[in-house]
Regions:
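Flexible "arm" and connector segments at domain edges
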Residues: 1-62, 68-194, 198-261
C-alpha cells in the first residue's frame, strides 16, 4: 500500500482539483449545501451497497464519491468563512482523542461493549449533561436503524432486559395484539401495533447481537437472486411470468433454493 506521504500528496491533489472545479465549472460553482444533500444520501447508500457486496473496486470508487461530498461541504463552508477542511480534521481528531481515553488516557476498557458504554458517558459530558439521552439519535435516520439506535442508547443507561430471553414473550405479545387489530379491520391501530412488532423484533436482534439492517438486506438480496432466477427461467422458456401459476413459480423458486441462491 501507499506511504503516508503519498496519501497526503494524493489528498492535497484532490483538494486542488476541487478548488479548480469550484472556480471554473458552472455546475460545481452552482452547488450549495441544500442542493448537494440529496446526492450525499444517494452516494452513502451506494457505498453501503458496495460494502454489502464486498466489492473492493466499487468500495474504492464509492469512498471517493463520499469523500468528495465531505470536502465539498467544507469548501462551501470555507467560502462563507464558517469552516474549512483543517477545522473538520482538527475537530474530528479532538473528538476521537476525547472519546478514546482507554487509548490516549488512563481509562481501562477491555471490551468493545465497555468502550461503547464509555462513549455514551463521554458524549453526555460533551453536551454538559444537559441533553436528553435520546436527543443524539438523528431524526433523519431510516426508521429501522433509528429504532436500533434508540434501544442501544437506552441500554447504555441501564434501561434494558435483565434476561434477553424474556424478549420473546414481548415479541409474541406484540404479534398477538397486531393480529387482533387486523381482525378488527382498524387500519390505523393495526399499523401502530405492527410498529410495536417491528420494534420488539429489532430489540431481539440487538439483544442477540444481530444487526437488523444487515439481516434484512441479506434477505432482500436473497429474494432478488431467487426472483431473478425465476424470471430468467421463464425468459429462456419463452414464457411470460404472468402466465405461470403460483404452483409453477413455487417449483422454480425451490430450484433456486436448492442451488443455494
Amino acid at each position: 500500500m501507499h506511504t503516508r506521504k503519498e496519501q497526503m500528496e494524493a489528498f492535497g491533489r484532490f483538494l486542488d482539483v476541487l478548488d479548480e472545479l469550484r472556480e471554473k465549472c458552472p455546475w460545481d460553482r452552482k452547488q450549495t449545501n441544500e442542493s448537494l444533500r440529496p446526492n450525499t444520501i444517494e452516494e452513502t447508500y451506494e457505498l453501503c451497497d458496495a460494502l454489502i457486496k464486498n466489492d473492493a473496486k466499487e468500495i474504492c470508487k464509492e469512498l471517493g464519491d463520499v469523500l468528495l461530498h465531505v470536502a465539498f461541504y467544507a469548501k462551501i463552508g470555507s467560502e462563507k468563512g464558517d469552516v474549512d477542511m483543517k477545522d473538520v480534521c482538527d475537530r474530528l481528531c479532538e473528538k476521537l482523542i476525547f472519546r478514546h481515553p482507554h487509548v490516549f488516557g488512563e481509562v481501562q476498557a477491555d471490551t468493545a461493549e465497555k468502550v461503547t458504554e464509555n462513549w455514551e458517558q463521554l458524549k453526555m459530558k460533551e453536551k454538559d449533561g444537559n441533553k436528553m439521552v435520546l436527543s443524539g439519535v438523528p431524526s433523519a435516520l431510516p426508521s429501522l436503524i433509528k429504532a436500533y439506535r434508540i434501544q442501544d442508547k437506552a441500554r447504555n443507561v441501564g434501561f434494558d432486559w435483565e434476561d434477553r430471553s424474556d424478549i420473546w414473550k414481548k415479541v409474541k405479545e406484540e404479534i398477538g395484539e397486531f393480529e387482533a387489530e387486523v381482525e378488527q379491520m382498524d387500519q390505523d391501530k393495526a399499523e401502530a401495533e405492527f410498529g410495536d412488532v417491528m420494534f420488539s423484533l429489532i430489540n431481539a436482534a440487538r439483544l442477540y447481537k444481530i444487526n437488523p439492517d444487515n439481516a434484512l438486506e441479506r434477505t432482500n438480496q436473497k429474494f432478488i437472486r431467487r426472483f431473478n432466477y425465476l424470471e430468467e427461467h421463464t425468459i429462456k422458456a419463452g414464457i411470460n411470468l404472468k402466465e405461470l401459476s403460483l404452483e409453477e413459480m413455487d417449483a422454480i423458486w425451490d430450484e433456486a433454493k436448492k442451488k443455494g441462491l
